[in-house]
Amino acid sequence: MFLFRVFRSSRTAIILLLCFLVSPCLQAQSPSHYEPSLESLDKHPLPQWYADAKLGIFIHWGLYSVPGWAPLIHPEHDFTSPDYITHNPYAEWYLNSMRLEGAPTKAYHREHYGADYDYYNFAPVFNREIQKWNPDTWAKIFHDAGAKYVVLTTKHHDGFTLWPSLTPNPKLAAERQHATRDLVGELTAAVGKQGLRMGLYYSGGYDWTFVPGPIRVPADYEAVKPQSEAYGKYADAHMRELIERYHPAVLWNDIDYPKSGHPLQIMAEYYNTVPDGVIDDRFGVKHSDFISPEYVTLDKISPTKWEECRGLGRSFGYNRAEGEAETIAPADLIYLLVDIVSKNGNLLLDVGPEADGTIPPVQMDRLLALGAWLQMNGDAIYGTRPWKRAAGETAEGIPVRFTEKDSAVYATLLGQPKTTGITLKSLSLKVGSQIYLLGQATPLSWSQQGDAIKVSLPATLPGRYANVLKVIGPLS
């Protein structure tokens, strides 16, 4: 993944500004044909499936999964830190990190593989390991976790592709260019059988086989973007292959797109091939269907659809150094999803498999917890829209997040009540309205007390992490 370029102090303000600049017209009818112009592309409406989905699974898998290591120095992704690049916690940046003097990854590589061991020697190892992989197993796991779509890295910054591309890489030996199995095609088929949609990530802005770098300082982020005519044609050809062969529901580019390429043409061809597809905001042009903050949650409801991408841990790619302490806790993961959805967002939650496709046990634990919670409480998530405000609080100090769907408002408690009653502050409800607890069929007793609603709860609550009140009636 890209190191998100907006410093933490100003990220949210810039992201919210982008909401207005890139907002697609949600009421517009889909044109029968798109042209490679912003005027035409901006007529693309946000598909209802994407607005309803709320949860996707991101997968970072490639040569970097073989060493599968990054340092754990920066727990909060402090991109402004002077040593962030040399101590990059993203394991998928292994190739860059192993070439930096003073980088822990360089020392790790020297110790485990030798100083002269070429990164692309991992290709035959990866291709041997992927023979153990079962795409149907992944698809079932993602379905049971509650995801509605999946996004796979088809080519990351190292240039290695997860499909047998018909466009050869002039910088790499044939046996080191791509996976020997069509991982993209196989997972697309498996995901479809589970009723999920398949999206594809492509690193258009970086390809370290064309411009190796390395990236040592922030100024290098732009300098290492390949802009040659040859690379523009190469990226365009890859994009066309992915669109024509796999019809991805999400076209997820990263790090901008080469100026020598034709992003507007690619977008038009994509919409004409997949009319209900969506495009992210990382092509470097002023069109997208959603914005994509990385490890950042917006502070308020956004008028534009947005999708937070983040790993279950600090890395997107597999990092064998990560464990419980570096992995988001089940409760925090559920609270994060609820918070994002209340503000008109989706969560694109990343898993980092080992080279053979094994999902680390600590990540499996989180997926199972999330899936179990969604099985009971999914009505408050899927197909909902933000209510008139995202956040509230009980008189007892429990944070609340609101969503709505049809005639119901859902109030999700981000914490466990310590008594058999809670008071929802600054809310009023008309007599005759009903309040239910998701997971139970009997309505709850409630009363209006001034500008607050007091709700009686059962002694035993059905939810382990976050319980949801379903309010049927005019809530204000």
Question: Which residue stretches match the model-derived regions?
Answer:
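N-terminal secretory signal peptides that target proteins for export/translocation
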Residues: M1-S9
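Bacterial N-terminal signal peptides
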Residues: A13-P24
